[in-house]
Amino acid sequence: IIDGEIHAKLSGTAYDKISVAPGEGYYKSADNEIVWNKITTSSLGNIGPGESGSINFSFTPRDFSTPLKPVSNPNLSVNVDVQAKRLSESNVPENLASSAKRSMKISSRLSLSSSVVRSQGPFTNTGSIPPRAEKQTTYTVMWTVNNTANTVTGAEVRALLPAYVKWTAKTSPVGEDISYNSNTGEVVWRVGNVSAYTVNTSQTRLVFFQIAIEPSVAQVGQVPVMVQDTTLVGRDDFTGENLTSTAPALTTHFSTDPSYKEGNATVAP
């Protein structure tokens, strides 16, 4: 087989032509196409019986993480056409051709942030800071859910409260489906559907709930965990993929609050 030639045509809403690295090929950006032939890749000039090989190229999907660069239902497609000639026994060239297509759907980026505050949020918190052994101090937990390119359905956030942490039953805003199971110590926020491109918009999903900690004398000098690791799950409505995001455990170290001072997190006698 002689005069092999490969054409890879790139397309899709997430295709970023500036990011293409064609490897040994020639990138025709005006046509969104990469070409390999015997000039760019000498091994394509003459292909012996049983021989095989590979070519490589790369590209990065468009940035669709913010509403400033929206890409609805991002997808990518690569159409590959291969042409060559085969010499018959009579030395007459015979044209050969083959093609393949690969399409990809790109999932949304579903994200969760979790923080604890004292002076911010919808509730008035009480108790001493730093927290004292066998005395109750309240804190406000804030969960935020954001999403990028595709609508997400069935989103849900879950976390466990330790035995020494109490649920005060104060939640905000009204209408968010958040509950606490006193038997298991689990807090569940049934977020439901999350719109595309919520970052820095009014569509960002946010919930507050209040907890109270009553440390034991055995926790003096420690920085107790108040909310265990938190997990967000949801289903990408475009790709069908199950998405997950996690946030680390929250402690009495509420340094994201402007009122926080060094030493405020450690349990005092």
Where are these regions (language model features)?
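...the same signal can extend to comparable exposed beta-sheet modules
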Residues: 1-2, 7-24, 29-49, 54-60, ...
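Short, acidic/polar linear motifs in exposed loop/turn regions
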Residues: 1, 14, 63-65, 145-150, ...
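Extracellular/luminal low-complexity Ser/Thr/Pro-rich, glycosylation-prone repeat/linker regions
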Residues: 19, 65-126, 166-172, 176, ...
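Intrinsic-disorder/low-complexity, polar/charged segments enriched in Ser/Thr/Lys/Arg/Asp/Glu/Gln
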Residues: 5, 33, 52-56, 99-101, ...
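Low-complexity, intrinsically disordered segments enriched in Ser/Thr together with acidic residues
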Residues: 38-75, 83-88, 142-144, 190-239
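A surface/secretory-pathway sequence property marking extracellular, secreted
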Residues: 2-42, 115-119, 153-197, 254-267
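Surface-exposed coil/turn segments at beta-strand junctions on protein surfaces, enriched
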Residues: 29, 48-52, 69-73, 105-107, ...
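Short beta-strand elements of extracellular/lumenal beta-sandwich folds
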Residues: 1-7, 123-158
